[in-house]
UniProtKB/Swiss-Prot annotation:
The keyword Ribonucleoprotein applies. It comes from Paenarthrobacter aurescens (strain TC1). Forms part of the ribosomal stalk which helps the ribosome interact with GTP-bound translation factors. It holds the Pfam family Ribosomal_L11_N. GO terms for molecular function: large ribosomal subunit rRNA binding; structural constituent of ribosome. This is Large ribosomal subunit protein uL11. Belongs to the universal ribosomal protein uL11 family. It comes from the Bacteria. GO terms for cellular component: cytosolic large ribosomal subunit. InterPro entries: Ribosomal_uL11 (IPR000911), Ribosomal_uL11_bac-typ (IPR006519), Ribosomal_uL11_C (IPR020783), Ribosomal_uL11_C_sf (IPR036769), Ribosomal_uL11_N (IPR020784), Ribosomal_uL11_N_sf (IPR036796). One or more lysine residues are methylated.
Amino acid sequence: MAPKKKVTGLIKLQIQAGAANPAPPIGPALGQHGVNIMEFCKAYNAATESQRGNVIPVEITVYEDRSFTFITKTPPAAELIKKAAGVAKGSATPHTVKVAKLTQAQVEEIASTKMEDLNANDIKAAALIIAGTARSMGITVEG
């Protein structure tokens, strides 16, 4: 077995799917670790092509020899909630001004999408996490 490569950095970014380019914030974040920026952009765009229109978080692990690996996550819960509720952004004052409503079924659908990234044992616990995020955005959950 080949010797394990030494990790020199971990970069976390949230990038539009299929739209990574060397401009900020991607270029500077990768440049300071010596990563080939265009190589990452091409690989990321190819990996996220099917999810265009979503913001996809990515964790990039940079190694000593300037090579890298990356793991894409599911879109942020807030983005999925905004899309389901049909609003551009959450409420500026979430506890006084409500901007939209979600049904329990919509919350469970978002929870099942996010399940692999959430620290929850079952879909009910995941739905409660999503409902809490929605509440903090000024979106009420019915049911």
